[in-house]
Amino acid sequence: VRRRPEAPVIGEIDGSMCGICGELRFDGRSADIAMLERMTGVMTPRGPDSGGVVARGPVGFGHRRLKIIDLTNKAEQPMVDADLGLTIAFNGCIYNYPELREELAGLGYRFFSHGDTEVILKAYHAWGIDCVKRFNGMFAFAIHERDSGRVVLARDRFGIKPLYLAEADGALMFASSLPALVATGKVDVTIDRVALQHYMTFHAVVPAPRTMLNGVRKLPPATVRVIEPDGTQKDTQFWRLDFTRTPADVARSAEEWRDMVLASLRQAVRRRMVADVPVGVLLSGGVDSSVIVGLLAEEGQKGLMTFSIGFEEANGEKGDEFVYSDLIARHYDTDHHKIFIPSTRMLEALPATIEAMSEPMVSYDNVGFFLLSQEVAKHIKVVQSGQGADEIFGGYHWYPPLASSNAPVDDYARHFFDRDNGRLGTHLNPEWHLTRDEARAFVEEHFAMPGADDPVDKALRLDSTVMLVDDPVKRVDNMTMAWGLEARVPFLDYELAELAARIPSEHKLSQGGKGVLKEAARQVIPHEVIDRKKGYFPVPALKYIEGSTLEMVESALTSQKARERGLFDQRYLERLFADPKSAITPLRGSELWQVALLEMWLQTHGL
């Protein structure tokens, strides 16, 4: 069965930015097409250009499509290759697909479309699940083998593309967004107490496979899951970031590393210019996004557009970094768009921002990315963005203290954790508190894994393969996809990340962090942007909660729904309401915003 709602066709693009979903039944019943269409409908913002559902017996796939690469309808999804007996639903972009297509054509494969989706199908047929090792890009996909009934799910190395899973009612369901699974009405939506502890401790990061809901899990990054028709499942992790170094790596000079980083980053930016449409940059004014602009300009990107956002100041804290983004825009003569957001508009946008979150995300810049993406999507469909540079090249303030640490887990927790488990016990109601410190145990286990000996390397590995996946990367995916915009992240090119992991940490920690990247950037961009205090995406009104913002969060946390749920200790909430500015986490976040955001997210999604 194949169903396609009528949708406008805008030329021809491929699997790029989209939403996928599916159902695999294990009880002999056929896939529920109406349910698949419901799930697909929830994800319409992710793929506003077209949509479709394909079902065969117990297996059904759904897809929403934003056209980026192959602008014809031959690339419609779910894609069925009747000759090979394979069906695919794919979300993402494979940057090296032209080379793979050429190689597969040499093996005798014939192609009926021009984009990357069909290349994945042929690659899977040729090389099995090992095909993922050959993909350079961001991806989440499902492939159904007609003859065996087997289904294969896969997610890229850094989890740039999401994939949520739920098992219920004799079936496995999957989707690009958690709300799409909730929309089935079949999943257990009770709160996972371990996930709650992670959220409240590990700076709102809930590592895979957990989510805030007991009935929803997420496929870990760099994982292929093979599901047989009888429901048996097997996971294979196909990539690990390795921080071990050869003697030659240790001996290499800072200048050599600088040149290698610049060459690799240049290649990463070039790869992400693949699309048949113009590319823009989310320009914060920091070194990461600025060097992307510089490299795109050097590569001859025509009509380069840049976008920057700023907010009203609060409590004497500035809300924009336009002085630096203006400098870069002028230097490269970009088509520059500056968006200033007054606090009233920021508040008005919060409900829609929270609705766009697949999981509760506490970072203030979610609303910034949401509003920025809204503006950018009026002009273009693809942007490059600087996420990942701090985690890959060591830009955060908690790395230098680890360099001489004898107790790396303690030192990491002291800088990164929002609260210890003892304090958490006074913030949560007793039935929600766990005596075992799950977040700390998670960090201990991760630090103990082989492949990273130096404490800084252990922290970089944790941050780049866990924290980055479930905070900055997810934030950018959710907020850009809310407006049908595709964000590409060159700093998460896996070859660049592998190179960076080999660089001794002293080269990363120099110059106040990201030293080797800053030296590479000096070859490209004006030094004023490099030799400055590290900035961030400031939204002061959410850090210093007062006035109408305070009214909004107090209303959510004292509502009937919140009282029935009973997550938080009432005395703790009253202290927060009385003096929000007194409760700031080590990472300079508001405790009140953290608890309010969780409650608002639950209510927004009808939970």
What is the role of each PLM region?
Residues 393-416:
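A mobile, often basic/glycine-rich helix-loop segment
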Residues 253-257, 261, 321, 360, ...:
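Conserved acidic
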Residues 2-4:
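Basic polycationic patches enriched in arginine
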Residues 10-357, 369, 519-523, 528, ...:
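Cysteine-centered catalytic environments shared across enzyme families
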Residues 11-20, 30, 56-57, 130, ...:
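Adenosyl-5′-phosphate
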Residues 380-390, 394-396:
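Short acidic/histidine-rich active-site segments
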